[in-house]
Amino acid sequence: MTLQTPREDVAAERAGRAGLITLDRPAVLNALTLPMIRQIRGALERHLADPAVEVIVIRSASAKAFCAGGDMRRIRELSLHGEFDAIAAFFTDEYALNLAISECAKPYVALIDGVAMGGGLGLSVHGRHRVVTEHAMLAMPETAIGFIPDVGASYFLSRIDPAIGMWLALTGARVGGAEAVASRLATQLTPSDRLPGLLAELSDVSAGSIEAVLQRFAEPVDLAPLQAALRKRAAGFDASSLADVLAAWRAAAGDAALAAFSPAALASSFELLRAAHGKPLRECLAIEFELSMAFARHPDFIEGARAVLVDKDRKPHWQS
């Protein structure tokens, strides 16, 4: 009889000079659990301590998704059972990981091939090198489940074009690989069929030549038209009041579009991004933690997560 051992959702190994962290929970698009977050943090620390590792690479075992974000369905279950200490542990460790990635002393490369949402951006955008492919799709969709853009999103979305950052935060709009480069969420576009070659070269380089290797595998991106198109889609989202932002959004998309988003989450997300200007990531994460704990108890989160993640009828009945 073969004994079955628990399957690891995160694999850590060294390939030459590259310390690899591989997400492998494909059935749920690598949605992050607390054990996964702790496994990633442990792998990161081991690679940092290993003198043979020159570069740290995080990737997915599946081409379908890099990481679909935190397991918010599980957070909803914990909330319904009043297990707020467990929720606090999840967000505490997740945000600590985001900060650790931002402070990583070795080059950190995220290979984003497929979906990257919410917590998936927390694993990638804070790193030095964010490589997207033509299959990449990035988004911060939290307001549709009655939550706020977290994992340091208030930090990185407040540091790109103001209208585009607010548009991404409030609407959960999805951007492709080239658009992610144009909006500065990603640092380069690399065709998916070139990722194996890129990884092979990263495993055989010194820290000083990593940038050159990455650029050799990068595809040129014509930024100007993409940035113009993004600004057009985000028109009006740089207004100084939420009422004006919502008016611009309503004029472009109609009342029905706004009904899909929690009014409380939209209001808090708007203020969160405006307050984040000039603040360091650590402070932004601390503010997000307080809001995340508040929204974990909010009826709009319970209802929004039900409508999007549980019943999937996408017909939320907001209480705010």
Spans of features found by a protein language model:
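Long, low-complexity C-terminal extensions of enzymes
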Residues: 248-253, 258-320
